[in-house]
Every structure is written in structure tokens, then in C-alpha cells.
Amino acid sequence: PGSTFDWTNSDASIGLAASGTGNTPSFSSTNNSANPVTSTITVTPTANGCPGTPASYTITVNPIPVVVVPADIVVCNGAAVSAGVFTSTTPGTTFAWTNSNPSIGLAASGTGDAPSFTGTNNTALPVTVTVTVTPTANGCPGVPIAYNITVNPTPAVVVPADIVVCNAVTIAASNFTSTTPGSTFDWTNSDASIGLAANGTSDVLSFTGTNNSALPITATITVTPSANGCPGTPVLYYITINPTPVVVLPASITACNASTVSPSAFTSATPGTTFTWINSDPSIGLAASGTGNLPSFTATNNTVLPVTAT
């Protein structure tokens, strides 16, 4: 009874005065460094003018840990995302993290670093998630820090139906569409002889189909969509240009009245060609028109002059 106390504080940076008398007051602890700060409080009692033996105790103020997170990440659907490595200048710091949308392929939460994973986005739009990291050291939680991971979708392209036209016919423009905004399109043409360039970007413009051969020409148009730097799956459609068939006729025929004219066969280098014919003068004994080859007929001329039919 009657004792008084004088105390000293070895490190006033913790928020407590360097010295005082009586009990130590309440104070707000402070540590703006990355490491724990330990201060020694030495208390000397005095009674009846006689000093006692000093006694000491310590106050340790642990820092609030700060986490350093990766920069924001942007990847394509199906791409590998590297592990998110978290660091702190405070030794022994641990990390807990949450992910706002596990659909991208990363778990909803975890501890330590965020593991590597395969980015997943099965929608038509970019998906951006927030990864929030909370550091803890010596039982003291730090301020949560967030970074973003964006997984862009794989764009899909819708192409026209296959096109079949005749030689020299104008082909309308082919318009490509995608449900992913901002998609662009690159295309290739397997046979530029049809009148279309070998490659291009955006839509295929209108052109005149060309086929100077005797057989149909089918070109493969391969369209590859891209959006946000991510390529989509190429899609194909076909443009077929049918040739202009050419008929090979027999030699001109001269016959006498009442004689039999043999059948006349027509040919073409284009397979599947059919023939339609007309006769300018049915009086010769041949019908005015028909299909296929000319049939045999009996030549007729009841005049006194030669009759020529075309």
C-alpha cells in the first residue's frame, strides 16, 4: 500500500508514450512496418521513498499484412491460366481467397495461392470474375485485395447454306453472323477459278460465278471467327458453279424425198446433259420439236425445189 510506479517504454512507435507514472494508459497500437514490433515496458515501484526492483514486460504489436496479387488476367476459353501467386513482405503471412464465379473453372474459395486451371466459358459473352485475397499474419487479418480474371468465349459463326449456280450467274453476298459481339471473320476459298478471291475478311462480297470447264466446280469456303483475340472453330460451306454445257452436233444431212433418215445423236462433254431441239420446217417429215436425239424419219419434199430445215 502506498506504492507508486514509474514506467518506461522502449519503443514509443507502438503508440504508447516513452514514459509515465501510475498505470499505463489505454492506447491504439501502431505498427506501420512489415514485421512485428516488440517494446519493453519497465516498471519501477517506489514506497516510502524507497525504490523497488524494476520489473519488465513486453508489448508486441503485429503489423497488418499487405498482399500483392497478380495483375488482371484475360484468357480465351480452353486456355491454361497460370497459378495466382500471392506475396507479402510480412513473414509467415497466409492467404485466403474467394472467387465470385466458379463457372470459369476455378474453385469458389481456397487458401494459399490460387492454383492453375483451364479457363472455361461456354457462353457467347466474356465472363469476368473477381478473386478477393485476404492476408493474415500473426493472427492479424490484412485488407482484402482483389484482381480480375476474364475468360473470353470461343466465338461461333453462322454461314449461309450451300450455293449452286450456273456459269456466269451473279452470286449474292454471303453474310456471316455470330452471337459474340465484335466477332470478325476470315475466310478462304479453295478454288479461286470460280471468280471469288482465294481469301478475305468480313463477309464474302457478291461475284459472278465462273466455270469454263465441262464439269461442275465446287469450292470450299472456310470461315474462321475471332472475338477478343480468341479464334473460333472454322465452319465450311460450299459454292458449286455448274458449267455451260456444249452440244456436239452431227454433220449436216442431205436426203432424197421418201428416203429414210437415220437417227441423229447429240453428245456433250458435260455429264448428264439433256437435249431439246426444234425443227424450222416440219414439212420434211420431222416433228417441230422434241427432246433427246433426233429420231429416224422418212424425208418428205413434195415441191420441185430442195427444202432445207434447220
Task: Give short role names for the model-derived ranges.
Residues P1-T310:
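Extracellular low-complexity Ser/Thr/Asn/Gly-rich intrinsically disordered segments
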